């Protein structure tokens, strides 16, 4: 899930590969989303060379958003940043035909143990803990209602 294409030892034995990726959050998070996108494409180009037609599924991706936090220009933890991150990530997914699945982390915010990396829990949900939609929920509704049923016919 976290190996890179040139270091993964098990991927050649698998029928498909699954990855957890957070370019723009844990990797190159903040003001440099363009840098995160370029780094993500670089990794994906590497996967294109080693997958030989096998599908790739993203089993985790996302960014935290404190519900109700709005900032312009966008900053990490804001609704605007979460949407910009998701749009960038989806653009990378859509660029590669071998990407055949995506599972956002997470459906809804949830409580975690105390710590400096989480503000009263994990806030990567597209819904709040009370199951109210964040701005990202509307982005996903648009994406999921417009994705083609046959991924081989999607546009790049």
Tell what function each PLM region has.
Residues 1-156:
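Substrate-binding clefts and catalytic carboxylate motifs of secreted carbohydrate-active enzymes
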């Amino acid at each position: 899930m976290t190996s890179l294409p040139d270091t993964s030892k098990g991927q050649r034995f698998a029928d498909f590969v699954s990855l957890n990726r957070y370019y723009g959050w844990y990797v190159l998070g903040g003001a440099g989303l363009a840098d995160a996108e370029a780094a993500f494409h670089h990794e994906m180009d590497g996967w294109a060379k080693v997958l030989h037609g096998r599908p790739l599924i993203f089993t985790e991706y996302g960014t935290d958003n404190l519900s109700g936090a709005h900032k312009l220009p966008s900053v990490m933890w804001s609704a605007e940043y979460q949407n910009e991150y998701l749009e960038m990530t989806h653009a990378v997914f859509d660029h590669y035909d071998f990407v055949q699945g995506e599972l956002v982390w997470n459906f809804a915010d949830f409580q975690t143990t105390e710590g400096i990396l989480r503000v009263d829990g994990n806030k990567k949900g597209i819904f709040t803990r009370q199951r109210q939609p964040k701005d990202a929920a509307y982005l996903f509704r648009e994406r999921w209602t417009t994705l083609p049923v046959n991924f081989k016919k999607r546009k790049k």
